[in-house]
A protein has these predicted regions:
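Hydrophobic faces of well-ordered beta-strands that scaffold small-molecule active sites
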Residues: 85-87, 134-136, 176-178, 204-206, ...
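Active-site gating loops and adjacent loop-to-helix segments of metal-dependent hydrolytic enzymes
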Residues: 81-83, 87-116, 146, 242-275, ...
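Aromatic-lined glycan-binding groove of carbohydrate-active enzymes
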Residues: 285-290, 294-331
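Catalytic metal-binding/acid-base residues of hydrolase active sites
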Residues: 90, 239-241, 285, 304, ...
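Mid-to-C-terminal alpha-helical segments outside catalytic/metal-binding sites
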Residues: 29-65, 73-85, 92-133, 160-164, ...
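Active-site gating/metal-coordination segments in enzymes
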Residues: 132, 136-280
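N-terminal secretory signal peptides
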Residues: 1-40
Length: 407
């Protein structure tokens, strides 16, 4: 199960089985079954995703079709030379995995995926897929549960691991989003600036709430202000819910339905992760983040985390109640302040829904490696029946523009 809670949260919830609905016997059964469960975890739910989309476009939408197998083959052959920048590609280290895994089986599973492998295996997968560049980011929840100076030092070590490791060993193949100690906002802002100016990082990636606060909270404004000043984006990756939310939304009193971690998958990659990011996006608009930081840029993965599906309802209802409090129409912020990626959602109909509302100029390619097959993602996109110009924008040109890099 790639989608699980960090060890400390998991342990706390299992110290009180009556409260958290996990008896000792159920725990042991779950752990004994872990290898099978891990295999069917995050990838299973993501590959089975259905109607998600995204939201808001000024220009006419790009139309996707896949009329016949022959036409698909012709399009795919035409675009075999397409270049790719992967904008959501995950890594970890033995130290980080030890912090954020629930047991030894889970740690072994993450090792088997290649999450901590930043050498020949990863480069080989990139070459096989035809992925030119990976933008690396630390596995959720990263260091956001590590308090004080310990978290500050840990974030620095993770960032330096990339600079001194794969970025130095394979020049041009790896870029990175900074890991930030967001629980210490001033230090996080300083580490963002240091990593961008000294090490050439492209921005930062966050993982859900920070001590039960989202990025619209006043405490986190130093990070937003620094990102805007540096002209670098922040990627909103999902995180795990606070315990109170987990209990109300995702837990059950029927312990036989927790033996295979149904509630954890439900609260994570099976559903909760996507709802969590979408909520944070709406909060950032509604509570004036982009009025205070008008040029701040936010990236959202997983084909918009459900936003396209809900787009007209959200815009219709939220526009009315924010017209006096916001400086611009509600939906305009989606045009001006958000970018979206394809990570892990390799489906034509989802991309079509995304492009119905979001300009093709604000969509970027991503795979979500190693939790999905990288080649599956590039093969899928090569066969998407879009004009070559639009496909180049999504595959690499939009990322080149946003991050000021070249493939």
């Amino acid at each position: 199960v790639a989608c699980v809670y960090p060890a400390d949260v998991f342990a706390e919830r299992h110290q009180h089985p009556a409260q958290h609905n996990f008896g000792v016997e159920a725990d042991m059964n779950a752990i004994e079954k872990t290898p099978r469960n891990l295999v069917m975890g995050r990838r299973h739910f993501l590959s089975g995703a259905t109607a998600l989309g995204v939201g808001a476009g000024i220009s006419a939408p790009a139309i996707i079709s896949r009329a016949t197998a022959n036409e698909t083959s012709e399009v795919s052959l035409r675009d075999q030379d397409l270049r790719f920048i992967g904008t959501e590609e995950t890594f970890s280290t033995p130290e980080l995995m030890a912090l954020n895994t629930i047991n030894e089986d889970h740690r072994l599973y993450l090792e088997e995926t290649g999450l901590a492998e930043l050498g020949p295996r990863r480069i080989g997968a990139m070459d096989e897929a035809g992925l030119n560049v990976q933008i690396l980011s630390a596995h959720t929840p990263s260091v956001q549960n590590v308090p004080g100076q310990e978290g500050i030092d840990f974030a620095y070590r993770l960032n330096k691991t990339l600079v001194d490791g794969p970025m130095a060993t394979y020049p041009g193949r790896f870029q990175a989003f900074a890991t930030l100690p967001l629980q210490s906002p001033e230090a996080a802002a300083d580490e963002l600036e240091r990593s961008v100016r000294e090490d050439g990082f492209l921005g930062a990636l966050t993982n859900g709430h920070i001590g039960k606060k989202y990025l619209d909270h006043p405490d986190l404004e130093p990070v937003l202000a620094r990102a805007e000043a540096l002209n670098v984006p922040i990627y909103l990756h999902p995180g795990y819910p606070p315990d109170e939310v987990f209990q109300i939304y995702y837990s059950t009193t029927r312990s036989n339905y927790t033996e295979e971690y149904q509630d954890y998958i439900f609260s994570g990659s099976g559903y909760g992760w996507h709802q969590e990011v979408l909520t944070q996006c709406i909060r950032m608009i509604t509570y004036g983040v982009f009025d205070r930081f008008p040029t701040l840029q936010i990236i959202v993965g997983h084909m918009g985390e459900g936003l396209p599906f809900y787009y007209k309802r959200i815009v219709g209802d939220m526009s009315e109640v924010t017209e006096d409090s916001l400086k611009k129409p509600f939906e305009q912020y989606f045009h001006d302040n958000f970018w979206f990626t394809t990570s892990a959602f390799f489906q034509d109909e989802l991309l079509h829904l995304l492009l119905k509302y979001i300009s093709v100029d604000r969509v970027m390619f991503a795979t979500d490696y190693p939790f999905v097959n990288m080649k599956e993602g590039t093969d899928w996109f090569r066969a998407v029946n879009l004009p070559r110009e639009d496909k180049e924008k999504i595959a690499f040109r939009n990322a080149e523009k946003l991050f000021r890099i070249k493939v």
